[in-house]
Amino acid sequence: MAGGSGERFWPLSRVATPKHLVPLLGARTMLEETVRRVEHALPAEQIFVLTNAAQIDACRAAVPHLPPAQFIAEPAKRDTAPACALGTALVRRLDPDAVVVFLPADALIKDAATFAGQLQKASALAAKDDVIVTFGIRPDHPSTRFGYLEAGAALPESTAGCPFFHAERFVEKPDAARAAGYLASGRFFWNAGIFLWRTGTFLREAQKHQPDLAAFIEAFPKGDASAYIAKEFPTLPKISVDYAIMEKAARVAVVEARFDWDDVGSWTALPAHLPLDAGGNTIQGTVTVHGSENNIVIARGRVIALCGVRDLIVVETEDAILVCHRDSAEHVKQLQPHLPDKVR
């Protein structure tokens, strides 16, 4: 799924080239890194990119080895449940018994081999039973940025290298006190937003809980579906797959991820993955610092010089500059309504 806006990464992230289409952490975009990672488990012809009309050309350019037909543009922004319904419908017409894997294009996972191995085991579980499978990340701190899921009893399919549990419940992003309690309990995982199901399993759950999504899947044409998608997709309810399906589904299993994971949610995520100088500054581009500490500085064209400052985020592009305190990184998206259209 590659249709997000990435507004917290402005000014590098824009409407047509958001976070997953920007080389934030290296030479490749996050979308290309995601596709390369999935190719450890699946052949390229089975990988589809769900995006939108504003981003589809840039997505195709980022992953040129995938055929253009494997990039699907959603005609309207309807959140993740309709996106999952669209992806399920596309795969269902190719193979009614197939297992579909949905994953975000903008998460960072470096251990591709472990990821691929667990993905294959999760796919086998989803194929065998009418169960939806999701990945959970064991938290190492009480984050309030993620949704959580509570794990119950271990499943018979569980192994030391790939633990499976019954998913008891999904919970929204908690406050600090609840997050601390979740961490202390040892029963809660961060929701990684990675889901697997057989097409028939998703359809049955949609029939019970989201009949509009079920009807969309059932009426999906076998031939050219572009006109159908353009007409029907914008009418679907705007709702996340967590609320629409995952919280209500009869059987959900959670896999404890044994690979590294970071959703790279804002500028403050970069220091964990990029080199730091002696002052703890994270620097990309031509940057000079003097008496400055703990800054994140990205220069994409001009020279940036910092003197006697700390805890700043400074990002320079050809047509815009961001300066903010590190503590305000989560609020960068709130600039969007106030920015000129030409730099959004």
Map each language-model feature to its residues.
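A residue-level structural signature of the nucleotidyltransferase/glycosyltransferase Rossmann-like core
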Residues: 48, 100, 168, 187, ...
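A short acidic, often aromatic-flanked loop/helix-cap motif at beta-alpha or helix-coil junctions
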Residues: 77-82, 141-143, 176-178, 261-263
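Conserved N-terminal catalytic core of the sugar/cofactor nucleotidyltransferase
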Residues: 8-11, 15-18, 23-120, 137, ...
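Conserved beta-strand scaffold positions in the cores of enzyme catalytic domains, especially
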Residues: 21, 71, 132-134, 251-254
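Conserved core of the sugar-phosphate nucleotidyltransferase
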Residues: 112-235, 253, 326
